[in-house]
């Protein structure tokens, strides 16, 4: 297995322009495909998950032109449901941001009835999709599980979504609700979506609603408990370029490195960003970092850090970065209400606890929380960090190099899921 050893970094300094957001890129591509008109998507992320979405759209008959650097995509919208070839099988890797929304969109009524299969990597077959399928079936969708009940692969018929009242469990992933919301305007009649349990990751729903609005669809949001969507509508391509914001989750590693040991400015997101993970900077500020907000940048500067005890359900991806940042703070850090870490690219709670212990940390792993004790710079131990084919594990643990000890990252190329050039960018900012 390939490995990368990072030698100790004495300080980080500089500016980085963020690649496009994964969540926004795949939503933009799907909305552009369903819309009437042509959309020019700019600052698209070039990564595995986006490639899976693009390959799926091509197989579904969507025409697009991708620039040489793969960051600009001109999509010709099909103005409604996909024209599905019967028996087509789409392989979506481990891209949840492609699997969930496509599963809903492929239920929409096509001109000719057809069945399609959605599948992916072995890990995708372990990632739950039952809450979405249960909701889709309530509004008339025909979806079957091909292997294990509640998990992909799925066989989906494009027989239509009827609309009406539907209940969806919001406690595991907001992507299920996002998938249903994005397809609801193309249903046969109005849809009233009621959330069962507490909705996790609400800021990701804000992203979905904001982007649907950009493509001409308004949703009535009643305090995240009920959503009303008119049926028999159509998306309309927005005028001019459709800019994908920089990835706020990817910003977290650079902002944390600045807060621990230097000064880093990230551009491509700012105070007007629609991404919830921009609030990661507020957590760093609570820990003691100096944070500066601009219209299109956030800057983090080193200052003594102290541990925090916080509910981070609203920023689950960026919260992982707090787990490694906590090692450099004074006092313990507790990250709470993060059960959904367990259903991501890997079981991130167990993975994080296991790898933190390897570098010498004292960690308590609860069912939905993690408690981390800090380490003195000289007490970090050199370790080979297992990344579990999870891009965020690789990027989080790169921060260990800000101690007095080197760190070895196994399978560093797993960052290709969202940020193929991550280690190159980190190197540019590093002073040894």
From Swiss-Prot:
Pathway named in the protein's UniProt entry: Metabolic intermediate biosynthesis; chorismate biosynthesis; chorismate from D-erythrose 4-phosphate and phosphoenolpyruvate: step 6/7
Main location as per UniProt: cytoplasm
UniProt key word Magnesium: no
Keywords associated with the record: Amino-acid biosynthesis, Aromatic amino acid biosynthesis, Cytoplasm, Transferase
UniProt binding sites for 3-phosphoshikimate: 22-23, 27, 173-175, 201, 317, 340, 344
Gene Ontology biological process terms, A to Z: amino acid biosynthetic process; aromatic amino acid family biosynthetic process; chorismate biosynthetic process
EC numbers: 2.5.1.19
Catalytic function, reaction form: 3-phosphoshikimate + phosphoenolpyruvate = 5-O-(1-carboxyvinyl)-3-phosphoshikimate + phosphate
Active-site residues annotated for this sequence: 317 (proton acceptor)
UniProt superkingdom: Bacteria
Keyword Amino-acid biosynthesis: yes
Residues that coordinate or bind phosphoenolpyruvate: 22, 96, 127, 175, 348, 392, 417
Xref: InterPro entries: Enolpyruvate_Tfrase_dom, Enolpyruvate_Tfrase_sf, EPSP_synthase, EPSP_synthase_CS, RNA3'P_cycl/enolpyr_Trfase_a/b
A GO MF label: 3-phosphoshikimate 1-carboxyvinyltransferase activity
Pfam family name, one: EPSP_synthase
GO cellular component: cytoplasm
Compartments where found: Cytoplasm
Subunit structure: Monomer.
PANTHER family: AROM/DEHYDROQUINATE SYNTHASE, PENTAFUNCTIONAL AROM POLYPEPTIDE
Sequence similarity: Belongs to the EPSP synthase family.
Biological function: Catalyzes the transfer of the enolpyruvyl moiety of phosphoenolpyruvate (PEP) to the 5-hydroxyl of shikimate-3-phosphate (S3P) to produce enolpyruvyl shikimate-3-phosphate and inorganic phosphate.
UniProt name for this protein: 3-phosphoshikimate 1-carboxyvinyltransferase
Name of encoding gene: aroA
């Amino acid at each position: 297995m390939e490995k990368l050893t990072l030698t100790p970094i004495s300080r980080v300094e500089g500016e980085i322009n963020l690649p496009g957001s994964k969540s926004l890129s795949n939503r933009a591509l799907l909305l552009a495909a369903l819309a009437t008109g042509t959309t020019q998507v700019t600052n698209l992320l070039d990564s595995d998950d986006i490639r899976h979405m693009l390959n799926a759209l091509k197989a579904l008959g969507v025409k697009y032109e991708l620039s040489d650097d793969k960051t600009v995509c001109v999509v010709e919208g099909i103005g409604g449901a996909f024209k599905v070839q019967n028996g087509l099988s789409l392989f979506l890797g481990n891209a949840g941001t492609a699997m969930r929304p496509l599963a809903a969109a492929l239920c929409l009524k096509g001109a000719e009835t057809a069945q399609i299969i959605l599948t992916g990597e072995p890990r995708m077959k372990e990632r739950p999709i039952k809450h979405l399928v249960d909701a889709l079936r309530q509004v008339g969708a025909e979806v079957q599980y091909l292997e294990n009940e509640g998990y992909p692969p799925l066989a989906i018929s494009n027989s239509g979504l009827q609309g009406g009242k539907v209940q969806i469990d919001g406690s595991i992933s907001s992507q299920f609700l996002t998938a249903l919301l994005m397809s609801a305007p193309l249903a046969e009649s109005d849809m009233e979506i009621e959330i069962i349990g507490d909705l996790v990751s609400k800021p990701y729903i804000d992203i979905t609603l904001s982007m649907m609005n950009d493509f001409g669809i308004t949703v009535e949001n009643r305090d995240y408990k009920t959503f009303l969507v008119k049926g028999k509508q159509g998306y309309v391509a927005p005028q001019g370029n459709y800019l994908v914001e920089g990835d706020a989750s990817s910003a977290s590693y650079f902002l944390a490195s600045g807060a621990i040991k230097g000064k880093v400015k990230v551009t491509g997101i700012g105070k007007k960003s629609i991404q919830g993970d921009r609030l990661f900077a507020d957590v760093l500020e609570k820990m003691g970092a100096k944070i500066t907000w601009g219209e299109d940048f956030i800057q983090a500067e080193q200052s003594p850090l102290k541990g925090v005890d916080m509910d981070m359900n609203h920023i689950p991806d960026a919260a992982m970065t707090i787990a490694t940042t906590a090692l450099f703070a004074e006092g313990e850090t507790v990250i709470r209400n993060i059960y959904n870490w367990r259903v991501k690219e890997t079981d991130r709670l167990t993975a994080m606890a296991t790898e933190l212990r390897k570098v010498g940390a004292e960690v308590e792993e609860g069912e939905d929380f993690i408690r981390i004790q800090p380490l003195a710079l000289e007490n970090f131990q050199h370790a080979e960090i297992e990344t579990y084919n999870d891009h965020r594990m690789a990027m989080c643990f790169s921060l260990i190099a800000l101690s007095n000890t080197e760190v070895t990252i196994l399978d560093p190329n797993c960052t290709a899921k969202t940020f193929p050039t991550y280690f190159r960018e980190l190197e540019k900012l590093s002073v040894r």
